[in-house]
Structure formats: C-alpha cells, structure tokens
Swiss-Prot record:
One of its GO terms (biological process) is cell adhesion. This is Agglutinin-like protein ARB_02240. Residues 838-848 have a biased composition (Gly residues). Glycans are attached at N106, N217, N583, N654. Keywords: Cell adhesion, Cell membrane, Cell wall, Glycoprotein, GPI-anchor, Lipoprotein, Membrane, Secreted, Signal. It is found in: Secreted; Cell membrane; Secreted, Cell wall. The keyword Glycosyltransferase does not apply. Residues 680-872 are annotated as: Disordered. GO terms for cellular component: extracellular region; plasma membrane; side of membrane. PANTHER family: GLYCOPROTEIN X. Its main location: secreted. Disulfide bonds: none annotated. It comes from Arthroderma benhamiae (strain ATCC MYA-4681 / CBS 112371) (Trichophyton mentagrophytes). The GPI-anchor is attached to the protein in the endoplasmic reticulum and serves to target the protein to the cell surface. There, the glucosamine-inositol phospholipid moiety is cleaved off and the GPI-modified mannoprotein is covalently attached via its lipidless GPI glycan remnant to the 1,6-beta-glucan of the outer cell wall layer.
Length: 890
C-alpha cells in the first residue's frame, strides 16, 4: 500500500512539475521566454555615407576683398584692446573688419556684386584691459562707414557679361559622383556556461560611442551667364510680278471690190449674127474694223526692298546630365561596447548558486575608410543668344503677261471681179459690146487689237538682321540639411491638431535659411513631423505644376513645383537628376555640414522608382490642401493618389524593392493621423490603407516571434536576456524608436476585409474595439488608449491604415503616430511576417513566419513550453493521482 501510494505520488508530482515548468506567454512580448534566450551575443554597427554635390566654378571676377586689420593688438571681433577714439580710421577699420566688412574708401563702396554701405554706431565697445562694466559710449555722430556683404571676408562674385558675336556654342559637362560605401563590422561574442537559469534577468547595457568628427562639404553654385550674339543672315526673297498692258489700236479696213465685165451683145438680124459681150465689174466693199490680240512677254522688274530686321530668336540647349565624383577619406575610429551584467541568482534542485555580475568590454577598431560619393546632376540648360548676319532675300517674280489691245481703223478692200464675155446672138446682126469695169468700194469699221505681253519674274533682295539670344543657365543642386527641428522658433503653446509643420490648412511651411544651412537650394525630402515653422514662415500654398503622369514602366523627368517639398528620390533608388527646373536662378556658394554619425547610417530600403510620380503627387497634394476634412474624403484626390502609390509600390515589392508601409508610410503619417481623428461615418468606410497602428489581445491566431534583420541600428540602451551565461546585446537607434514596449505584427493575406469601428467609453479609460471580418482568420482585437485596426491587402480600401493580427503583442508602425506612450519617426521594418522589438533592442530569432492556418498547436519558442495550461492527458493523470493520494491518505 505504501509503495503504491509512493508511485502515484511521484507520478502526480512529475506531471505537476512538468506543467509548472511551462512558461506563461505574456501578451507584452517575449519576456516570458526568459528561461530560454538565444545563446549568443551579436553587436551591430551601421555605416552610412552621405554626399555633397560640388560643381566646378566658372570664370569669376573678384570685385571686393576686405583687407585684414592692422596688427595693432586687436585679435578678436568687435573689441579692440584699447578703447576706440571717435573718428579714428584705424579703429573703424578694425570695427568694419570685425563685422565682416571693409572700411569705405572716400565714403563710397563698389556698386557690384550686391555690396552695400552701412554705418555702424560705435557704442558700448568695452576696452579689454580697462575692466569697465559700462563700456565707452559715443554719440550717434561717431560712426564708421563700412562696405559690407553677407559673410564678410574675401568674396568672389560672378559677373554676368553680355557680348555680341556670331558663333555656335556647344557645352558639355561630365561629372562623376560615387556615393554610398557601407561597411559593417560584426563582433560575435559567445559566452557558454552550463547553467540553467529559471528567472529572466534584465541586463542594462551601455554602449558609449564617441565619434567627434564633423565633415564639411563645400558646394559652389555659380550664377548664370547670358551671352547675346547678333547674327546677320542674308535672306533672298524671290517675287514675280505680272504686268498686263492693253494697247487699243483702231485699224480701219478698206475692202475694194472691182468687177470687170465683158458684155457681148449679139443682135440677130435677118442674117444670123453672133454677138459676144464681155463684162468686167469692180466692187469696193468696206468691212468693219477687226481686233487683233497679241501676247507679248515683258521681263519682270527686280525689286530690292529695304533690309528687314527679324526679332531675336532664343534657342534652348539642354546639356546631358553630369556626374561629379567626390572621395572622402574618414579616419579610423574605435568603438568600445561595454556590457555590464548584474549579479544573478541560479536556483537548482537542492542548491542555490549566486553568480557575481560580469562586465564584457568589446573594443572594435574600424579602419579608415574611403567613401566615394557618386551623384548625377541634372543636365544643365544652356540658352545661347546670338545675332545672325543680315539675311538677303532675293524675290524673283514670275513672268508677267501684258495684254495689249490694238484697235485698227476701218480698211478699204477692193475686189475686182472679171466676168467672162457673153455672146448674144440676134437675128440678122451681131453686136459686140466692149468689156466694162465696175468698182465697188466697201468701208469697214475700226477694229481693236489686244496684245498680252508676259514679262519675266523680277528678283527682290531683302537683307534681314537676326539677333539670336542664347542664355546659358548652369544650375547645380545644393542639398539642405534635413528639417528635423527649427533652431530659431519654438511655439509657446501646443498647436492645433490640423497644423502641419506649424502652419494651418491652406498654407505651406517655407523655412528661412540659417547660417547652418549655408546657401543650399534644394530640400532633401519632407521635414520631420516634429518640425515647426514660425508664423512668418507660413505662406499661402503656391501654385503647382500641372499634373504629371509618367509612361507606365518608365522613369522620366519630374518638373519641380517651387515652394513644395518633394519626397527624397533616393527612397525610390533614383538620383536627383530626375528633377527638371523651370525658370530657375542659380544661387552662389552652397554650403552645409553633415555629422559623421549621419555617414554611418545604412541607406534606407527602396521602393520601385517608376512609382515616384504617383507618390510625390500625393505628397504635394497633401501639402497644398493641409490637414483639412476635405483631404480625408474617400473620393478626394489625396486618397486616390495615396491608394495608387501604395498599389504601385506593393505590386512591385520583392527581394529588390520594399513595400509602402516600410519605406513611405512615415511620409504621409501626419496627414493620415489627422484623418483618424475625424468622426467615423456610419457604416463601412472605404479608404486606402497606407499605414498601420494597432494593439491586439490574445486570439486563436498563432504567430511565430521572429526578428527583422533588414536594418541594423544603434542605441545607447538595450535589454538583454540571459541564459546559461549567454549575453545578448541588441542595439536599436534612438532616433528611430524610443519605445520600451514589445512590438509584434502578423501580416494578413486576406485580399479584402471589412472593418467596423465602434467606440466604447468606460469610467476608467477609453477603449476602441475593432471587429475585423476576413476570409483567413477571425480575431477580436481591443486596444486601450491606442488606435486599433485590422489589416488587409494593400489594395483594400476599407480602412485608413493596414493593421496586423498578432497574438498578445503591441504593434506600432511608423512611430505609433502619436498614440499611446511611444513615439517614433521612422517605420518599424518587418521581415518574414512579424517584427518584434523588446526594450528598445532587437533579438535575432529563428522563426520562419506564420504557421499554416490548419495548425492547431502554438508554435513554441526555442526551448520553451507551448502554453501555461496543462495538456488534456496531464489533467487526467493529475486527477487520477489526486484521487489515489486521497484514497491512500484515507
């Protein structure tokens, strides 16, 4: 009996102990798996290079150079060692030099290069060796005349010269820029200790990284040069003039008809006699006048008009894109990573072992690296002004036909007709009549003769003077620093929620240039969500370029709308040479600085470049409208463009290109977050889903906790989990995230989903409940004091933001959008379906994504139990053992 009882007791104890060793899966993240952390330590260092475009200077003329002050002991600006004396030229010279100017010569300044004259009152200038607290005051009449230009010192100004000449100018600029050298240093450290630790231990890790290096990139942008050339082009204009001359000549025509008749009379007498008569008749007939038309060709005259001056012609010559090469050599740097592990207590069966705290110092020396930056500048637009030579135009007129009508007077035509002699036989006698002549005169009326003469064409020579003006405009891009914070303005009170970058709807932020910006002329990407403009920097939204649409599958030129921020083309794998500028005026001397920490960031993931037109159009539309309710309407242009941008990028996301949420969601987050604050209309809402912010509770959906390794970042604090003396250090950039909560997401493969959003208010806190309906999984998610939504396919337009369905995790995409207690500016990269971040760090995992939907068991963490609840068989065995114990006890 005792043996049976002991066996049953042992079996029950084993089952209970096996169930008790199973770890509870906390909804806050993978801290519950503290008993089974990975057994290695990995340290990551990200090196990212940035670049500055340099352009070669053109021919310049130095028109003003401020000379250094005399060496009289004054070695610092604005404060001579001795008190200045009123009217002293020496001290005025020092004073002007300290102001970055030069002393006026004869009270005048050069009138070139923007140099202006100002008078400075010498007041309150302390004598350095006097110790006076009041200083030396002078009357307003004690002034110094200084010739100043912004910046002071020696200034080089490009003077625009115009000259007239006949020439053909071909300009070609070739520049080579090499950019982005990424160097990754991996320092694997493995500490093995055959000890099993039951309790998780949080190890604060401090990674001191000091890189006191500042890289200054000089960029010089030169003014345009206008060359006017007068070209005289001879032009020959051929003209043909037809002259018709009508001559009327009256030609009288006389027709004389003469009739000659011979009459022979035959008289018959008693004796038959033969009489022969011959008649000759002459008839004169006057015919009417006739009109004769004669065509005469007369050679055309040559007309030479005066010279004609044609208006100037402007030819625009677009030069091909140029490439600039810049090589920056960085010195070697040493990075020391110190991980301090506190004392830990190890509990084993029967014994308690307390391990002292350990400190691991990892020193890594990064050798000097050479960063070659390649940028392709957009082709320069060259406009050449030239005056062509006088043009001589010879105009040859066609042959002219001159019709001359000549009217002839009436003519007299004489017709003589001779009749043969006739014989008349009379009986008895023969009488012969001599021949007679009859003259008939006819007078014809006057006739008109028309003659048409065709003259040959004549040549007219016209000399035309053409003035062709070609303007060569050389434009270079000088990148401005990223707008993260405004050093010149801080609002006194919180701004309304519909203010974007400190400006109300309908207005756009245009930051003023600061000395730190130098003479930059192009903003790199959109400002940070925390950037605030002062009220005087808010301007009405300027007009934009007409809508632009690229040919599908091609990358073309993108015309920049002045005053608007454009998405960084490098996020699309493009360069700045896609930009085209209309009516640009180049500035002089671009200068900005980049810290070395920015150079050590890895380049961001990119999306397909052919989607830039749709995405940038959505950004400029949002900038023009602002945070206004009309922007958030489902049929608004902004929502349509965002949907097209997201569809284009997600359809092309593969191993080479990333998706919308990973790269572009932070660009649109500020406007989408504003739309989320508007009242929710009744019924389903159709909107694009460009981003995600959700918090879900435990559900039947199972997920595998893995870690995205797509980007490596750096942080000054992290949380490690320790098992068998295996220290894990995960470093996350503090600029990317400042959260301490765990983040996990599971992407949904549902092609379409319907989200119904309701708000529930309780006495303790505000709760949003989202009830998703999809074809793959049915989950109920609830978030407390955070935004909650259910994710769907990128093409779904039912909700504003895509979300993820996770098991007991909190997922924030793009820094949380201001919800909850976490804040971030960048997106949280995900990989293999789920991204998990714990305590600001990143722990590499071995998960392979979401298990098939047919899976019924939870995916176990390596070395951990599946769940806290005992299995069915365990319950049965425990129940039987308990009953046996009870019977044995009785």
């Amino acid at each position: 009996m005792r043996l049976t009882t002991s066996v049953l007791l042992w079996a029950a104890t084993s089952v209970l102990q096996a169930d008790a060793t199973q770890t509870y899966r906390s909804p806050t993240g993978p801290e519950a798996y503290g008993a089974y952390p990975p057994r290695y330590t990995v340290s990551y260092t990200t090196i990212t290079s940035t670049s500055t475009i340099h352009s070669c200077p053109p021919r310049t003329t130095t028109i003003f150079t401020s000379s250094p002050p005399p060496d009289d002991g004054c070695k610092f600006p604005g404060c001579p060692n001795q008190p200045p004396k009123p009217g002293s030229d020496v001290h005025c010279d020092i004073y002007c030099w300290a102001k970055g100017c030069s002393l006026c010569k004869n009270d005048t300044c050069p009138e070139q290069g923007g140099i202006y004259k100002r008078r400075e009152d010498m007041k309150n200038i302390f004598g350095r060796s006097t110790g006076s607290a009041e200083g030396y005051n002078y009357t307003p009449e004690t002034t110094c005349c200084c010739c100043c230009e912004p910046g002071g010192g020696k200034h080089t100004v490009t003077v625009t010269k115009t000259k007239t000449e006949t020439k053909t100018e071909t300009a070609s600029i070739t520049k080579i820029i090499t950019d982005y050298v990424t160097k990754t240093v991996l320092i694997p450290t493995t500490v093995l200790e055959p000890t099993t630790i039951i309790d998780p231990t949080t190890v604060p890790t401090t990674v001191p990284t000091t890189i006191p290096t500042t890289v200054y990139n000089e960029t010089t942008i030169h003014d345009s040069t206008t060359v006017s050339t007068t070209v005289i082009q001879p032009t020959t204009i051929s003209d043909t003039t037809t002259l018709t001359t009508t001559f009327t000549t009256v030609v009288p025509t006389y027709i004389t008809t003469t009739t000659f008749g011979t009459v022979t009379s035959v008289v018959t007498v008693m004796v038959p006699t033969t009489i022969t008569s011959t008649y000759v008749s002459t008839m004169y007939t006057t015919l009417p006048g006739t009109t004769l038309t004669t065509s005469v060709t007369v050679p055309g005259p040559t007309v030479t008009p005066p010279p004609v001056t044609l208006p100037p012609e402007t030819k625009i010559i677009t030069l091909p894109a140029s490439t600039v090469t810049k090589v920056t050599t960085l010195p070697a740097s040493t990075m020391t990573v110190t991980s301090t592990l506190p004392a830990s207590t190890i509990t084993q069966s029967g014994t308690t072992v307390t391990l002292p705290g350990s400190t691991t110092v990892i020193t890594s020396t990064i050798p000097a690296s050479t960063i070659t930056q390649t940028y392709t500048e957009p082709g320069t637009v060259s406009t050449v002004t030239s005056t062509p030579p006088p043009e001589t135009h010879v105009i040859t007129l066609p042959g002219s036909t001159i019709t001359k009508v000549t009217t002839l007077p009436g003519t007299i035509m004489t017709v003589t007709q001779t009749l043969p002699a006739s014989t008349v036989t009379q009986s008895g006698t023969t009488v012969t009549i001599p021949a007679s002549t009859t003259v008939i005169t006819t007078t014809l009326p006057a006739s008109t003769i028309t003659q048409t003469l065709t003259e040959p064409g004549k040549e007219i020579t016209v000399t035309k003077t053409n003035t062709v003006t070609t303007t060569t405009t050389s434009f270079s891009i000088s990148l401005c620093p990223t707008r993260t914070a405004n050093p010149t303005y801080t609002p006194l009170a919180p701004l309304p929620s519909n203010y974007i970058w400190g400006c109300p709807p309908g207005q756009l932020c245009r930051p003023k240039r600061t000395p730190a910006d130098g003479q930059c002329n192009f903003e790199v990407g959109l400002p940070s969500q925390n950037f605030v403009c002062s009220p005087d920097e808010c301007i009405p939204s300027p007009p934009r370029h007409p809508p632009q649409k690229w040919t599908p599958g091609k990358v073309e030129k993108w015309v920049v709308s002045p005053g608007y921020f454009n998405i960084d083309p490098r996020k699309f794998g493009l360069t700045f040479d896609i930009f085209s500028f209309e009516n640009v005026t180049a500035t002089s001397q671009g200068y900005f600085r980049r810290s070395l920490s920015a150079l050590f960031k890895r380049g961001p993931e990119i999306v397909a470049g052919e989607c830039y037109d749709e995405c940038d159009s959505a950004a400029t539309e949002a900038e023009a409208v602002g945070a206004d309710p009309t922007l958030c309407k489902p049929d608004s242009l902004f929502m349509k463009l965002v949907g097209q941008c997201k569809k284009c990028t997600n359809d092309r996301s593969n191993g080479t290109y990333s998706d919308f949420d990973t790269v572009l969601f932070p660009e649109f987050q500020k406007w989408l977050d504003y739309c989320d604050t508007l009242p929710i209309p009744s019924g389903p809402t159709t909107r694009p889903e460009p981003g995600m912010t959700s918090s879900t509770t435990s559900s039947p959906t199972h997920s595998t906790v893995i870690t995205s390794m797509t980007s490596m970042t750096t942080s000054e604090s992290s949380t490690s989990m320790r098992s068998s003396s295996t220290a894990t250090t995960s470093e996350t950039s503090s600029t990317e995230s400042s959260r301490t909560s765990s983040e996990s997401s599971t992407e949904s493969s549902t092609d379409s989903s319907t989200t119904e959003r309701t708000r529930t208010t309780s006495t303790a806190e505000s709760t949003e409940t989202t009830e998703p309906t999809s074809t793959d999984a049915s989950t109920e998610s609830t978030s407390t004091a955070t935004h909650s939504s259910t994710g769907s396919d990128p093409e779904s337009t039912n909700t504003r933001h895509p979300s993820s369905t996770a098991s007991g995790s909190t997922t924030t995409r793009g820094g949380g959008g201001g919800h909850g207690s976490s804040s971030s500016e960048g997106p949280v990269p995900t990989s293999m379906g789920t991204a998990t971040t714990t305590g600001g760090g990143s722990i590499p995992g071995s998960g392979t994504g979401i298990p098939p939907s047919s899976s019924t068991d939870p995916v176990p963490f390596p070395g951990g139990a599946g769940s806290l609840s005992p299995s069915t068989w365990g319950k049965v065995v425990t129940c039987i053992s308990s009953m046996a114990l009870l019977v044995a006890f009785i």
